[in-house]
């Protein structure tokens, strides 16, 4: 599809056919209305060709419970964990139902929230998706250049991290659990700043008795030249 739009059902269908095996295909869909509709149509087309298809819908964003783009929460950077862990299960030779089950388990245990201090230019529109002053930040951003939930005055990095983690930790109970952490650049935020952010994430989690098993810092799911970041926490068990 074009930048920030879903691929068409025909394109998705061709992709399914290109990778299909006897075990079938798992579609990992981010929860945006157009994506869900097009992928489900493509899945039905593939099933008519006797290709076994299953799906999961990722909705890890704690910032919104509904928007112009979604019914329910959006799928954002936590989708990377779904891809990697479901992919590892598939690589073990697991059946499609098992891969789907593990993917859904990741979705149930991952939460994400992000913030931006500079928008990106949406190619089809030729202008930024939202406006920000020099002293403002956009809280609760998605991944398609769309605005977040609200604007706030720009704050120090540690305070921004505190705000994001408060929302994430209030959504599911991470107390006493091991987690994987992802600090993800929205596109233009340099690694040095991401590691400063991650340092405070680690401090906050340690204070709350949450053990970090592994940390990922970098550009995993970006929005062109947007300057900002998101934090994802995945609650782990032995399988994940």
Short names for language-model regions:
Residues 64, 90-196:
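Mixed-charge interfacial surface used for oligomerization/domain docking
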Residues 1-23, 169:
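Glycine-rich oxoanion-binding loops at beta->alpha junctions
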Residues 36-50, 69, 193-199:
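Short Gly/Thr/Asp-enriched flexible loops that form oxyanion-binding sites at enzyme active sites
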Residues 1, 7, 30-33, 57-63, ...:
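Short, ordered loop/turn segments at secondary-structure junctions
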Residues 167-240:
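C-terminal non-catalytic interaction/assembly regions of soluble proteins
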Residues 21-22, 36-38, 51-98, 104-112:
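Active-site histidine-anchored catalytic micro-motif
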Residues 2, 24-33, 40-43, 54-57, ...:
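Short glycine-rich or small-residue beta-strand-to-loop segments that form or flank ligand, phosphate
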Residues 2-10, 30-34, 69-77, 155, ...:
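Alpha-helix capping and helix-loop boundary segments enriched in small/acidic/polar residues
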